[in-house]
Amino acid sequence: MTKVLLVDDDEMGCDMLSRRLVRRGFEVIVAVDGKQAIEAARREKPEIILMDMSLPVMDGWEATKCIKSDDATRGASVIGLSARTLSGDREKATAAGCDDYDIKPIEFDRLVGKIERILGLAKIQVR
């Protein structure tokens, strides 16, 4: 089962996305800020991290840089998520170490397609 670390401080949105990911066959771990994301990435060793970029304590940009610079966590793929649509954010995400970037509100099937592409999976089975 593919392990996903979902990092978002929006409790309702996080819960909804988490439930949908579980129904698609993912194991989901949740963190609510950048510091928790780094700790969870070290502890849980997820294959993919869905990282909101606007977070308390430590933002997603900085957390992604830390995760990608740590030997213990750099193998995890990161998809940056943001409600912001500012010019240059996609490039900023790439510079931070994100493997892809998506805009909120999340279009679930598109997000799963990005996950499958990044992980090289042909299809994630529904449980």
Predicted regions and their residues:
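Charged docking surfaces used in two-component/phosphorelay signaling
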Residues: 15-23
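Short hydrophobic/Thr-rich beta-strand motif most characteristic of the beta2 strand and flanking loop
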Residues: 25-32, 40
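Residue-level signal for the "D+5" position in two-component response regulator receiver
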Residues: 30, 55-58, 87
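Active-site beta3 strand of CheY-like receiver
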Residues: 44-50, 55
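C-terminal output helix
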Residues: 94, 106-115
